[in-house]
UniProtKB/Swiss-Prot annotation:
The lineage of its organism: Bacteria, Pseudomonadati, Pseudomonadota, Gammaproteobacteria, Enterobacterales. HAMAP family: RhaT. It holds the Pfam family RhaT. Belongs to the L-rhamnose transporter (TC 2.A.7.6) family. Keywords: Cell inner membrane, Cell membrane, Membrane, Sugar transport, Symport, Transmembrane, Transmembrane helix, Transport. The keyword Transmembrane applies. The keyword Cell membrane applies. This is L-rhamnose-proton symporter. The chain crosses the membrane at residues 4-24, 38-58, 68-88, 101-121, 137-157, 175-195, 207-227, 259-279, 290-310, 321-341.
Length: 344
């Protein structure tokens, strides 16, 4: 395994760690509705940071985006909106299935679809099956899926041991939402593939290869922002128990800390895809679809580790933690298998 691939895997791990931790600042927000908190974090992560970073990177911000046709930008935007729908469904999936089952099904589906659909649609899947490296990377995807399933099972054991249940358990509704979440969340992977002309144009402007994907986030995350923010704003405007005015009428010190913690969560969310771009740049082009598999499997891995560090796994038996550790080791094994396959 060469140094570039190792670096790519490491950067994907860093991005996934940021994703696994981003909700922690939100837990410090007090006396605000979820919709207000999510909107403030979203404004930072989906609009302010992508636009600011791109403005600093590009020699001529408006000329860069103006150089692309609608036919190029629209799929990127729509796949971003597709991801936004998946993002909303994610929360509803947890509501009806609980964390462990919801994460296991939703992440498992988005890992498979986001990773394999691109080479299938591009007619590259037969080539992958016909090469040793391709077969090894596909084996890595399968092993990662097993790891996700094991970690999810550990979560189920933990929930049972601690007496935790889904907010409104509904298997039929939850499964439908989990499948929808898994499919739509893969939109981010499809958007990155559709944005390749934007990456190439950024590279032609002399932008470092680590940063060429970042300008495309203005369009990708713009699509996701419209879906997420519209959902929040509609709820804030129509539900009687929600009020932006009430949220912003809290004591000034609390208002400032709420804004800062929400903004920090937004920054951490953005950093997952900042480092995703770095990792993506180091992955061999013929295996670029593997970036999504690495990100999603590392997200589950880091989520488990963060849970251990925050002592969320303190329950009456040791079995859940033991199963969690096995699942994490399987995901690490999967990343190594994929890395060796890409280097073959």
């Amino acid at each position: 395994m060469n140094n570039a691939i190792i670096l790519g895997i490491i950067w994907h791990l860093v991005g996934a760690a940021s994703a696994a931790c981003f909700y922690a600042p939100f837990k410090q927000v007090k006396k605000w509705s979820w919709e207000t908190m999510w909107s403030i974090g979203g404004l930072v992560s989906w609009l302010i940071l992508p636009w600011t970073v791109s403005y600093l990177l590009l020699p001529d911000f408006w000329q860069y985006y103006g150089s692309f046709s609608i036919a190029t930008l629209l799929p990127v935007f729509l796949f971003g909106a597709m991801w936004g729908i998946g993002n909303i469904n994610y929360g509803l999936t947890m509501r009806y299935l609980g964390m462990s089952m919801g994460i296991g099904i939703a992440i498992g589906i988005t890992l498979i679809i986001g990773t394999l659909m691109t080479p299938i649609l591009q007619g590259r899947f037969d080539v992958l099956l016909g090469t040793p490296g391709g077969r090894m990377t596909l084996l890595g995807v399968f092993v990662a899926l097993i790891g996700v399933a094991i970690v999810s099972y550990a979560g189920l054991l933990k929930e049972r041991a601690m007496g935790i249940q889904a907010e409104e358990f509904n298997l039929k509704k939850g499964l439908i939402l989990a499948v929808m979440c898994g499919i739509f969340s893969a939109g981010m992977s499809f958007a990155m593939d559709a944005a390749k002309p934007m990456h190439e144009a950024a590279s032609a402007l002399g932008i470092n290869s680590l940063y060429v994907a970042l300008p495309s986030y203005v369009i990708i995350m713009g699509g996701g922002a419209i879906i997420n923010l519209s959902y929040c704003f509609i709820r804030l405007a129509t539900l009687k128990n929600l009020s932006v005015k009430a949220d912003f009428s809290v004591a000034k010190p609390l208002l400032i800390t709420n804004i800062l913690f929400s903004a920090l969560a937004g920054l951490m969310w953005y950093l997952q895809f900042f480092f995703y771009a770095w990792g993506h740049a180091k992955i061999p082009q013929q295996y670029d679809y593997m970036s999504w598999m690495l990100h999603m499997s590392f997200y589950v891995l880091c989520g488990g580790i963060v849970g251990l560090l925050l002592k969320e796994w303190k329950c009456s038996t040791k079995k859940p933690v033991a199963v969690l550790c096995i699942g994490c080791l399987v995901i690490i094994l999967a990343a190594n298998i994929v890395g060796l396959g890409m280097a073959a």
